């Protein structure tokens, strides 16, 4: 084993991380000096809730999102937000400043590999080593999944073996210059990591920041869903469901007076949460992220039924007190700042929740032709989200069932990566692909900034986010997956 020389002080650690490609380096400066050499210390290293998946490089490509007009107008070619919101394919995205999304994904992978590659030689309880490696592999799979779906094409069985993917980092080596793998190879690696680790995970880990078995199976189900293996996705989702099928009843929250009064699902007490991963790491960073990217589009707003508590509990369209983040009269709605507080309610923008497992079960059953089961899973979820009449009738066709599931995914899986990833995978199917049309601005229409119509086609290269130039400079193998 290489001599590591890494120092840390768990949870009060000051990280100064320079990680800009698959062959990058890490420089950690601690407050307290504790050498990582014991099994327990490596195990603690796995739990890192502040993973910081900043969404600015892609989130405004989603038809679920909206933006304050002053953040876009005049910046249509110079910022990620401006380029994405106006679907500007003529802009050069390769010169944009990095928002650290790629860096943070691979920092997390580096952290996992530090455990996987070195814990066998650590001193301490030998029975903890297999668990630690299994947990680290589950999180390593999670970050590779996010990376390949952000920086490469969606998995297409017909082309995945030749489509450019991302670097696979399967061990701890700070000096390696790694090749870029294909999309198929990355998925094979992710699936292998999960299949070999999930049964070793605990049903109830030491704390909420360690992955449990329900998370492992839910992630495996999601990976198989994106891999278009409906039977295996369904089987994994059923195992996750058997371990945790809890849903928060939003009717109870409403009846108790709302989230200001009913705080029993705050912090680590939301039974739906399977993994604690946010867009910016919890705290002021996530608050700003949800303010900046917490505005939903008029289209998504109109998809919520009048009795849908997912809207009435969490959003407002007359948020005059949030004028810095919201354009009144735009037709959009914004996430209530008062609810953006872990002391009131824990909402996962990136991490997995049981609600997503219900939706995976609905989709896989629909894909396999069992519309009755698909309808039942959708209605079980809606029973906890809508007041009054919540049930949908069983659709007559698979297409109608899938259309309903897609709407439920949009209403339930807000922010983070979900809609962006869904658009990419559904755009591979003629029945479900979508051309997004956006008219903008709505409020501040002037001679300088007239209202225009912007269009994003299903095969747009904008759906593949370019690797940051800092990563490409460090690793010549990391060629772009787009022609730009």
What is the role of each PLM region?
Residues 81-151, 181, 199-204, 344-349, ...:
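Conserved, well-structured interaction surfaces
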Residues 22-67, 300-305, 313, 389, ...:
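Membrane-proximal, proline-rich intrinsically disordered regions
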Residues 43, 50, 227-228, 234-354, ...:
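Extended ligand-binding clefts on enzyme/binding-domain cores
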Residues 32-37, 63-73, 153-162, 203-288, ...:
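Short, surface-exposed recognition loops and adjoining beta-strand edges that mediate ligand/DNA contacts
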